Amino acid sequence: MSIRFIYGRAGSGKSLFCINQIKKLIDSDKEKKIILLVPEQYTFTTENKVLNHIGERAALNTHVLSFRTMCQKVFEECGGRVKQIIKDTGKHMLINKVLNEKIDDLSYFKKMSREQGFNNIISELITEFKKYNIDIDALRDLTDKIDDNELVEKIRELSLIYEEFNVKMHSSYIDTDDELTLLAKKLLANNIYANSEIWIDEFTTFTPQQLEIIRIISKTSVVNITLCMDKIENSDAEDITNVFSSIENTENRILKLMEENNIGYLNPINLNSKLPYRFKNSEELAHIEKYCITYPFKSYKGKNKDVRLYKANNTYDEIEKVAQDIIRLVRDRNYRFRDISVVCRNIEDYNKIISVIFNDYEIPFFMDKKIKLLNNPLIILITSAFEVLLKNWSYESVFKYLKSGLTGFNTYDIDRLENFVLEHGIKSYKWNEEEIKKLKNISIENGATEEELTIFNVMEEVRNSLISFHKLIEGKHNVRDICKALYEFLLSIKAFERIDEWIIKFEELKLEDKVKEYKQVESIVIDMLDQAVEVMGSDVVDTFEFFKILNSGFENEEIGVIPVALDQVNVGDIARIKGREVKALYIVGINDGILPAAHKDEGILSDRDRIELKEFGVVLAADGRSKAFEEQFVVYTALTIASEYLMLSYPMADFEGKSLRPSIIISRIKKILPNLVEESSLYDLSKGNDHFNKVISPIPTFNELIFALRRELEDEEIDEEYWGEVYNWFKENEDFKWKIENIFKGLRYSNTGEKVSRNKLLSLYKNDLGKLSFSVSRLEKYAECPFSYFIQYGLKAKNRKVYEFTPPDLGSFVHDILDSFTNKVKKEKIAWSDLDMIKCKNIVSELIDTKLKEDSGSILNSTNKYKYFSKRFKRVISKSVSVISEQMRRGEFEVFNNEFSFGSYNDGEAIVLELPSNEKVYLNGRIDRIDTLDLEGSTYLRIVDYKTGNKHFDLNEFYYGLQMQLLVYLDALLKNSEYILKKQALPGAVLYFRVDDPIIKTKGDITTEELEKEVLSNLKMNGLILKDAKVVKAMDRGIETDGYSLVIPAALKKDGDFKAGSEVVTEEQFNLLREYVNKKMIDLCEDMLCGDIKIQPTKDSDGSHCEFCDFSSICQFDSSIEDNKYKIIMKKSKDEIWNNIRDELNDDKKEN
């Protein structure tokens, strides 16, 4: 028989021509068998087209088929598959079996064959080999012809895998990729389509398998094939840069097939001779079709009415504009939702935001994409049950399993268990029966609550169900037994029953997509287990190997969904838009690198490999360069699919705020349509034409109403006059009535924090003895932010406890060791001058070992990671102690006491602040180290505070109440020196010492002495020192000879005066600071008890308190809200600070 080509560019009416010709055939010969062959994804829409144009009589003798459904039909009528068909999951399992058996014969692929995802790559390559009829022997013969050694290795090993796969496959099964080969054999043996009329539409190219089917059916039937291209004579030369190159190549291959098989050539039909049928109502779209791929091109001179271009700020703005425009078309131009499609090249990035916005705008839509099975709760349950075993009961795997929702435990119990597990660091061996019992017994001894005992019961239930399953799969077992154990485990925890319960709920909520997904997932899992038993039932594998196979199957499983209604906007990928009747099309995300898409992944066979194989007659799928030009055809198809209206858009920023560039398509369209105005949120043409453009559907209109009311409250001019009527409509609407009532509350909302009554605060802040007892650091926290303080110390809010070693834990640990070190030195009467690095190291090591031994449950004993930390702490503390000993050695100050507490009723009395309101506040604290110096009949005090961070004394922060600790400690000691020291004392210094083992950077080699000096300089104490040269020299004798100190922040001139930059203050200034710190503390306490809990975090040039606040999610501080303002810490000069302190103290004295 014969073949006829039907030529026509996009929109020329090829599909309509086919249907009209089919209608004529039906009218003239009602017995004629007619086949309309289209790609798989277009069968549904094509069937609708045929029924709409021809009517029900078309169903009698016209069959709309894809190559796959043709296989099914032929096998049903003629018999076919005598072997069981293997699905993708079984195929992956078979590949895995082949790789395991042939692993010793592989060298190039040996290492990568064990990688996750390699099975998928091989599966895709085998599919490609079969589609392109690649013969194993021909492939193997290439190894003697190719010079590229790497390619030779690839081909040799791929041939081995391919051959072994086919042997195993064909012994018991048939692959879906072999169906077309089997179909070809059936068609040769049975003249099922003899004297039929075959119409082939919507194909761009054909695989060799498909071409073989066309060859066979064209021997006995008339075959009509549509080609989307110009009719070009003598187009033998291949030009891949031509947009139609892939279709021209298809034409040439069919012509060659006809010549070799003596198939007749009917006169072709050329539909390009007249105005494209699709664009009969739009000159602009016809112009785009004609010139979007033509060089040189012509510019459209007419007015622009059918094409829009929108530059969006971001993807949200982009999709919201699309939604508004869809509503406009439906409302004002009588479009149906089914006439409209929204497409993009990166549908995964857009599907969620489209769903949210379209639902808000009440736009019915169908998301034309398959659902990944890997995210289904049943799959998460199965994979995590394996991961618990494979990852040794890690926190992540256990709670991934529990939070699947299918274990039978309620959310409340899971949350409480999670908190308990995090707090106690329960993972790995701690999940065993003995450890759980040990923890339970300890809790009972400590008076465990009923809630805690419930947690242990839940733990035991979780453990028992999983342990029972793990016992059956741990180690090596045959696949049949593992599958059986998994199925019985799912039954035992009633996972399938819960899935059925969810399906009922989804049906009640009319969530059709969810119903379809969950109805399929159970059968997919069981089918996968059946495939595993069928293919690998007797194979012995370990748990990890089976998990890898199972997970690989889940990764590739997708659930297809079909539209649940007829009148819906179709949303999908650009590549799947062909075959639909689309009046209005929205192409979104037209950005550089996205449309046209960039093809980067070459796979196992690179582009160079494919080109070289092609030279030896082995033709595979297109290489990257060819795919890039094929992508141009995808773009051409997208730009020409709409018949009446086209809107193009691109965002300037992605979801993370990163800037995006427009695609080259945008500049091309601008040149073709020079009168096209690029719109944006600032310049929107539709707003000028539509007075009611903000009244769309309830939710977005309600949002616009809020903006209008806000503008009115702020006395801004409102152009629209209809908001009063809109407001009344919402007020009468039952769904929005309560929201309307809350609008004004929201608009007038001042996020500042309300005042709390004094009595309430007193009850919150007083301790068990009925006293207001605070630490200085607490007052500093109030100064940082009153609201944060109230949440932490008033409402007692806490972060979830986690079993980890935090910076505060490190601080406490270091303080304890340094305290123990000082006490040991004092007790054993070791002079600081006798301490060298070795002695320091030995003492510190002994102290840390003793501490960890006494506290066997310490986190530092828990894992190798924390044991390493304890070794590091030994090094850091040893270095710090050696530096302290050197600092003591260089001066004359002596350690008087360490870890001195006041307000504990042990060492010293609390500092008592008497407030103007007559309340008393008792301040407590702990001084890390007190040093004293007796000099010329006077005693000087030096207070040292150890810090594990890089803390520096800042007079500016002191002034604002953010750094009061050192001066409060000094004041407390000086006031109580007669009691503590048995004599009056004077201020000597207040200093911070950083506990660290610094890394010293040098430009070249240095001596040990120079290195020690660098370390001393790096760990130099910082703070304030008495401006007295004798006292300063008593802190570091070296200052006299060197002129600068390696111990304190001071340096001397030759005349004995202090150099600029020395942190020295006079005794009078020390007294001013003491007086000011008392005033500041009283002011802060008074503000606190007056109920001032305003949301006012401090902010300086380095950042704000909010950056490190644990309660920012509670206060919702937002600087864009009028009343939410930072308390700015202005950077003042030292002279300005001293003047301010004096002025405030003088004012205070005047008032009193």
From Swiss-Prot:
Principal EC category: hydrolase
Binding positions ([4Fe-4S] cluster): 785, 1106, 1109, 1115
Ranges of residues in domain UvrD-like helicase ATP-binding: 1-338
Highest taxon above the source species: Bacteria
Sequence ranges assigned to domain UvrD-like helicase C-terminal in this UniProt record: 276-579
Alphabetical GO biological process terms: double-strand break repair via homologous recombination
UniProt-recorded Gene Ontology molecular function terms: 4 iron, 4 sulfur cluster binding; 5'-3' exonuclease activity; ATP binding; double-stranded DNA binding; helicase activity; metal ion binding
Textual note on the cofactor: Binds 1 [4Fe-4S] cluster.
Keywords carried by this UniProt record: 4Fe-4S, ATP-binding, DNA damage, DNA repair, DNA-binding, Exonuclease, Helicase, Hydrolase, Iron, Iron-sulfur, Metal-binding, Nuclease, Nucleotide-binding
Gene3D superfamilies to which the protein is assigned, alphabetical: 3.90.320.10, 6.10.140.1030, P-loop containing nucleotide triphosphate hydrolases (3.40.50.300)
Family annotation (InterPro entries): ADDB_N, DNA_helicase_suAddB, DNA_helicase_UvrD-like_C, P-loop_NTPase, PDDEXK-like_dom_sf, PDDEXK_AddAB-type
Protein's UniProt keywords contain Nucleotide-binding: yes
Record has Phosphoprotein as a keyword: no
UniProt subunit comment: Heterodimer of AddA and AddB.
Family of this protein: Belongs to the helicase family. AddB/RexB type 1 subfamily.
Protein name (Swiss-Prot/TrEMBL): ATP-dependent helicase/deoxyribonuclease subunit B
